[in-house]
Amino acid sequence: MGALQWLSITAAAASAVSALTPEQMIGAPRRTEVIPNPSGDTGLFSTSQWSFDTHSESTWWSLIDLESGETTTLTDDSDIEEIIWLGSDSSTLLYINSTNAQVPGGVELWIADSSDFANYKAASLSAGFLGIKSTVTDSGDVHFILRGKSYPNGTAYNDQLAETYPSTARIYDSIFVRHWDTYLTTASHAVFSGTLQSSTSDDGNVQYTSSGGLTNLVNPVKGAESPFPPFGGNDDYDLSPDGKWVTFKSKAPELPLANNTAAYVYLVPHDGSATAFAVNGPDSPATPEGVEGESNNPVFSPDSDKIAYFQMATNTYESDRNVLYVYSIADDTITPLAKDWDRSPSSVTWVDGDNLVVASQDLGRTRLFAIPGDAGTTSSPRTFTDGGSVSAQYVLSNSTLLVTSSAFWTSWSVYTASPDEGVINTLASANEIDPELSGLSSSDFEEFYFDGNWTTLQGWITYPQDFDSSKKYPLAFLIHGGPEDAWADEWNLKWHSKVFADQGYVVVQPNPTGSTGFGQQLTDAIQLNWTAGAAYDDLTKAWQYVHDTYDFIDTDNGVAAGPSFGAFMITWIQGDDFGRKFKALVSHDGPFIGDAWVETDELWFVEHEFNGTFWQARDAFHNTDPSGPSRVLAYSTPQLVIHSDKDYRIPVANGIGLFNTLQERGVPSRFLNFPDEDHWVTGQENSLVWYQQVLGWINRYSGVGGSNPDAIALEDTVNPVVDLNP
């Protein structure tokens, strides 16, 4: 275990960088949200950092003083999976050790003191578990819950001890076959509960030891699963503060998983003495009429009497508007709060027994909003934060919250705020700590507004290092995915606009029709409208606005790039006159052939977007097919195509098909493939190659490669290039 070490994180980094490079951005420390102790004077977080010298990652845990911002290194034990505060004692920690000396593939629970990390083992668990939550009950015992995989009979599934078969065959009688990056198996995910019994030694110290086994709280509900992979996690379940109840979210077990988004919030005793009941399911008298979409983020009130959660109205629509509901356990009633508010919040925190705070996308940021417990249907929640994007918020005292956020210019910011005072005290910001990020400033980024196809739209501009408005910089035009998504004021490891800009570009990121955080009407308008009207027209109008407004942007030598839906738009642009406005194009994991959507994993998505299956809505599928012969004949702009083997949302054949077509049309093109990545590229070494190839490609054709001696080139990648042409 590492010794405690003091580090000031409020002083500015010693040296400034001339530009943000991919190596600096990827290799900078990555910190988690800060979790306060019960007294609210100390926070806990972890940090990981990749080294391109050793090609390895280091991880350590730290404490931060919530008055001064000073931090201490708590431990650098790489076997520790996660740590939480235990009970009302502000110095006791409970953590999961990722190894188990007695059970291969198992984990252990340990108790430690935050002052010196003196520790002892409290329990041995027979499988891999994550996401522990706990509370100390009136008896002094610890009730806890955690998540893991489960056999169909409800017992915990251990990957290392699971039965193997002579054949590798997979056999399916229903969909899903695969999801995101994984083929589904008979093992599912579940929330388990357990108890640590307390005892007091002769010297007065309290110790905790395992009491009994674990109880699977999800398995008794046939077909239920929680959390649901790949994006389900700790926010999908909660433990009541009194330790008596557990709530969890599960997709509707009676509906086909690949075709539906409907999900319910369940309530179950911690000891599993009764089967979990869906409080807003079809059998509940409390279920609001006409509300049939996905539920998420169930959270108990401080008095354990209520559950706050979000739910969408429409089944099959993953980007419908979240509405905040409160379920009363005693009354078996559900009450909506601020039901008509035109935002879609994503996380909720109880400030006290009645009042709540939610985080929601709002005009290209994620802000905090206060919602009183008696908020009526037409109530308009009030925001009390501004720039950046909140990732976590915890109540300290007197309605003060500890907030973790990020922004374009900082990967991690920690501050206190309250609904009455707004931001109170900034404790830490990564760009003032990390040498890799020093020199980044909010002044490098600004928003702009332009007239789109049918409404005023927002976008972002990122300036290069040492920007001079008297000079001209090639345009880098980035199109976001989704399409129900948005470019936001947040740290983006996959598409960081400043990394693009510091090659010598002015980066423009428009938020067209379909974008989120600007009202539900803008989001909903993308349905059946990918190319025939608003969304595509919005992008051309954004380009024209930039061309007409900013003398320092060189649109003659511009480039365009985008992921997923953005990649679809890139290829659609390739087949249109608009494609000739750009010197180079980059498409990452985009669809190419319209009918190939039948291969996707989440069928609910495409069947909602195009209003039917591919045989019911043939015109909609064909009208958004960039591989149509007339479009292919127009292909001429150099294009980099990126697609990875484990992308089951938009399978890799789409990328190979596009590359084949470009090659046969004689268009300068390259195919970049990662066999171990999915719809996103997240591995650090792979991410570096991704940036090298993307930036090298656009630099070659925009002229930046010739004007900037430090510009990245395609040849910077050490991997060999396969070229079988004679």
From Swiss-Prot:
Chief place of localization: secreted
Species name: Aspergillus niger
PANTHER family assigned to the protein according to its UniProt record, in alphabetical order: DIPEPTIDYL-PEPTIDASE 5-RELATED, SERINE PEPTIDASE S9 FAMILY MEMBER
UniProt-listed Gene3D superfamilies: alpha/beta hydrolase (3.40.50.1820), TolB, C-terminal domain (2.120.10.30)
InterPro entries found in the cross-reference section: 6-blade_b-propeller_TolB-like, AB_hydrolase_fold, Peptidase_S9_cat
Entry's Gene Ontology cellular component terms: extracellular region
Protein name from the UniProt record: Probable dipeptidyl-peptidase 5
Catalytic residues (positions): S564, D647, H679
GO MF term (any one): aminopeptidase activity
